[in-house]
């Protein structure tokens, strides 16, 4: 891309400063006129059109079938047979592959048990992973690319015995999710304005989570958009 940009002459070049590094900027020839503005496709992608929304629902139905089968399998096997984090991720991938129109994962699956589940963007490998034990939380953060769109879903299940403190934290997070999911907000409201709905139950007890509440998802493209 650097050579391609360097070859542009006597043109008007749209530049989004927050998305272009300095090295690429320096490749723009002085004969060009630079216009600093947001990429016009960003706003178009930020709001899904009716066709995209309809197809995303179809993608999530397929993904939901795969995830439901996986969670059923996990509840039958986790804590009862020897099971490792990567094995669980592979099983989920098999369920997704069985869905018509599945193209592949939308990102590397986060399959984490116990303390690993508290690590943002943890990645288990065959060389470094943990067994899915008998007492604790198992978290799976995963998604798929389908012809109908892109998914990104996180679920947490209890394996074996969990403490009262763990139950409380789980319940508070669930309360926040339900509050945000069922909220009615006005046109023009930003994500920042409704963030408290998700964090409120935790804040009221003096807790918080050191992570974003959510993010945009592309349409058969980048899962973080």
Spans of model-derived segments:
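Active-site neighborhoods and metal-handling regions in enzymes and metal-associated proteins
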Residues: 1-225
